Amino acid sequence: MNRDSFYPAIACFPLLLMLAGCAPMHETRQALSQQTPAAQVDTALPTALKNGWPDSQWWLEYHDNQLTSLINNALQSAPDMQVAEQRIQLAEAQAKAVATQDGPQLDFSADMERQKMSAEGLMGPFALNDPAAGTTGPWYTNGTFGLTAGWHLDIWGKNRAEITARLGTVKARAAEREQTRQLLAGSVARLYWEWQTQAALNTVLQQIEKEQNTIIATDRQLYQNGITSSVEGVETDINASKTRQQLNDVAGKMKIIEARLNALTNHQTKSLKLKTVALPKVASQLPDELGYSLLARRADLQAAHWYVESSLSTIDAAKAAFYPDINLMAFLQQDALHLSDLFRHSAQQMGVTAGLTLPIFDSGRLNANLDIAKAESNLSIASYNKAVVEAVNDVARAASQVQTLAEKNQHQAQIERDALRVVGLAQARFNAGLIAGSRVSEARIPALRERANGLLLQGQWLDASIQLTGALGGGYKR
């Protein structure tokens, strides 16, 4: 070995010795891999239904100012949104707290102490009052003030990894806030259209009750004239009672829905007054392909992804803990036994300190922390994989339900048209004087009941379409 290569080798020897003396890092189980959905999710929907992804404010497509106002109130004042916002602020504060450890620190300190020296202790000579020797004991009033600086050198990237982990948590919390936003908007929209469905059903039931009352009045008149017996009107009376019971049930459901909307929108001070509007027409939409796009458009998947990224950075920080810590410290102070001497130039003291902490034997603490970090990371990855599978299943299930209900609505529309034709024929026969008016009412009641069934199916389709919008991410985009 020549002299030029000998000295660099000698210079690197302390570093090699330092690294060799670190606590050994044992091997752990292999990390899990993240799952991605298939390139295309087959939802078996007709091409005509595949019109694209939902918009971030998908509820505006209903063109209903009342619904928009309810959702805006919920997003602004709902307790769930407040909790999500505070979780983000907490994560940001924690990230800032970790980031402050990565830079230099500078402190100013000052103290004053009045003390009596012991003549029998280590500082015994200072207990004497001998001005010639520089002692004026036994009482002293000493003071110190000055600056102290420190810097923890993040050579192995431990602090940087911890900062990255915290920032990943911040991004995950932000995605969770968006998920809360979409869930809240979806819940308000579903309740709102359920209320509108019940309100429309209430109108139809009132029409049925009106027709039943017409039949009952006619039957009573015929009975009073001795044309029919009392038994013939019993069935109509029973049906009218059932209709009244259905009206009471609908009114109760509407009150429950209003109470739930009040809770979601934090609208507790006064009662919620909703106006009835027509239900939207049945129409479905779904993008042609999902695949990787679903990962970027589902806020819950993004939150799970960022938790995984955060956990991987936590592993890096746990690995960096096996290497030495290096700290630099410096101080510039004034220190004197007597306050009168505190501001003299001779009372000045200064120094620089370089410290090194080398983990050699820790009873397995560092390896245990590393095992915990890896286990938490594997748990985050497993949770992410589970969320991916559930997200794809949610889309497939919701899309299938939307398609099924759309087909049912089409069949129901045909049934309603046929029922109206029967009513038209009865009305024509009445106009020709061939049947009584009560027979027209008898023809209208089945048509109205089919209309009630159609409203329920339309409301079910609305609910399913909102669930499909949520399954597609509700307009969220990374």
Swiss-Prot record:
It is found in: Cell outer membrane. Residues 1-21 form the signal peptide. GO terms for biological process: response to antibiotic. A lipid is attached at residue 22 (S-diacylglycerol cysteine). The keyword Membrane applies. Keywords: Antibiotic resistance, Cell outer membrane, Lipoprotein, Membrane, Palmitate, Signal, Transmembrane, Transmembrane beta strand. Could be involved in resistance to puromycin, acriflavine and tetraphenylarsonium chloride. This is Multidrug resistance outer membrane protein MdtQ. It comes from Escherichia coli O6:H1 (strain CFT073 / ATCC 700928 / UPEC). The gene is mdtQ.
